[in-house]
Amino acid sequence: MKAVVMAGGEGSRLRPLTIERPKPMVPIVNKSVMAHIIDLLRQHGILDIVVTVQYLANEIQQAFGDGEAYGVNIQYSLEATPLGTGGSVKNAQEFLDDTFLVISGDAMTDFDLTAIIDYHREKKAMATLTLYHVPNPLEFGVVICDESGSVRQFQEKPSWGEVFSDTINTGIYVLEPKVLDYFPKNKNFDFSQDLFPLLLKNGDPMYGYVASGYWTDVGSIQEYMRATADVLYNKVKLTEAIGDHIGGDIFVKGDVEIAADARLYGPIYLGRGVKIKGLAGDFLCLKGETDGN
């Protein structure tokens, strides 16, 4: 099984965090969003990874290289211009000769990928969409499935008057390589707006798997802050601990110096090289020396 990590996003709604880094390289506590995704893939035995890159591609390539340091094998597919979600994966078609998983490099999740893949194979699906219940579906594609799990209806980013479900498309898919033959290479197309409506029209087997666990699209400053807080509050099942828990929702990793009179209010993450003096808190993720105010 191979995975395609879509990592070409610019992340304009995350500025200023993304002025000098691509969206997948934004740090969530102790590592980048994409590093968390790589960890999740490795946890589920998915070691062959194709990363689609476009905006500040060198930043991602330099950070992850061939993947050896992360225990995986990474190849890159470069887009000269943005091609959309489907177009970027189509651009990597030469690497995809069997069933593969698609996942965003800028989402935070702990979904059971093995269960999703098993479901896809059990249903003999052409495409399986990973779905999730959310309280506000307006920013996502809304999906309805029948009792068998077959996708019957969806609406991309509906208004409240168009909302017919709280089950949304997370952008995590298991696909058969044949679906990429529907569109030519170097053509801009989107999975939700172009490919999936076509599969539905053609009657191709397309199923939805409603996942449990944690998922959020780190697409705005608000969601970035929420994801960071959720990691600090242990709401996300990570593959490894973010650091040593020293009490009061305070985590440290590496060489950290805390002055005897320092006052800390969690949740806080203190990384290597941090020296704390005075007052620090809350929702802090620090690296290097800091003077509290």
Can you say where each PLM-predicted feature lies in the sequence?
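Well-ordered alpha-helical segments embedded in enzymatic catalytic cores
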Residues: H36, G87-N91, L195
